[in-house]
Amino acid sequence: MIFLLLMLSLELQLHQIAALFTVTVPKELYIIEHGSNVTLECNFDTGSHVNLGAITASLQKVENDTSPHRERATLLEEQLPLGKASFHIPQVQVRDEGQYQCIIIYGVAWDYKYLTLKVKASYRKINTHILKVPETDEVELTCQATGYPLAEVSWPNVSVPANTSHSRTPEGLYQVTSVLRLKPPPGRNFSCVFWNTHVRELTLASIDLQSQMEPRTHPTWLLHIFIPFCIIAFIFIATVIALRKQLCQKLYSSKDTTKRPVTTTKREVNSAI
């Protein structure tokens, strides 16, 4: 009878502990810059003094696919006596983005909460380029930047559609390229706008058409002058060499003819003597 009462008392205490134990999160959404560090935090309340030996805390990423994921979060155990389960992730990468489940077990009681981590990389550096289309009065304006998530590109006050494409870098970032081809009005400059919808961030770059424009190919008029010049120079050099050769042959023949009579006269004089 006493044993039964003890069992009932123990079970009642366990239910009370389970009812009192709760897990909360001070922050559900973390938006972190790519490459920086982050600490995801869960708070727990035991209702009394914390028994560190009875606590088990873990942070698990909720995967939507079957690909293996290496958990990179490290539990900061020095925070446990304060009722905090803090998980540190260094140098946040794109693959770290997603939803996480913070699970804390305290004896027979347990509870969990969800945390969401989003990664952003600002399109702060926009590279611009101006290209003159040969044999036309059109130009190609290019804006290119790298960031995350995928940004939208627009060209304000332009009715001509732009050709915008993107690719992924080895780090998982997006390299976005937008090309606009048009006949520019005199004295007008243009700008491209990168709008990152998920993090509500806007970046703008201006393009000055007065700056030096690079032709797509070498000017054809240079070829029209250079090639005939080379041909004429080659013909001139070949003609000079041929004339010089003929002149040398004539001079050699003239000297040979002059020497022969002198030799004959000498032979006749010797015979007479």
UniProtKB/Swiss-Prot annotation:
Chain ranges passing through the membrane: 221-241
Domain called Ig-like C2-type: residue spans: 122-203
Tissue and organ expression note: Highly expressed in heart, placenta, pancreas, lung and liver and weakly expressed in spleen, lymph nodes and thymus.
Organism (species): Homo sapiens
Induction pattern: Up-regulated by IFNG/IFN-gamma stimulation in monocytes and induced on dendritic cells grown from peripheral blood mononuclear cells with CSF2 and IL4/interleukin-4.
Protein name listed in UniProt: Programmed cell death 1 ligand 2
GO cellular component, one term: plasma membrane
Annotated family: Belongs to the immunoglobulin superfamily. BTN/MOG family.
Function: Involved in the costimulatory signal, essential for T-cell proliferation and IFNG production in a PDCD1-independent manner. Interaction with PDCD1 inhibits T-cell proliferation by blocking cell cycle progression and cytokine production.
Disulfide bridge partners, by residue number: C42-C102, C143-C192
PROSITE patterns (alphabetical): IG_LIKE
All residue ranges annotated as the Ig-like V-type domain in the record: 21-118
InterPro entries the UniProt entry points to: BTN3A2-like_Ig-C (IPR053896), Ig-like_dom (IPR007110), Ig-like_dom_sf (IPR036179), Ig-like_fold (IPR013783), Ig_sub (IPR003599), T-cell_Activation_Regulation (IPR051713)
Subunit details: Interacts with PDCD1.
Gene: PDCD1LG2
One Pfam family linked to the record: C2-set_3
Glycan attachment residues as annotated in the record: N37, N64, N157, N163, N189
Keyword Cell membrane: yes
UniProt xrefs under SMART domains: IG
Spans within the Cytoplasmic topological domain: 242-273
Side Extracellular, residues: 20-220
Domain of life: Eukaryota
GO BP term, pick one: negative regulation of T cell proliferation
Signal peptide start-end: 1-19
UniProt KW keywords: Adaptive immunity, Cell membrane, Disulfide bond, Glycoprotein, Immunity, Immunoglobulin domain, Membrane, Receptor, Repeat, Secreted, Signal, Transmembrane, Transmembrane helix
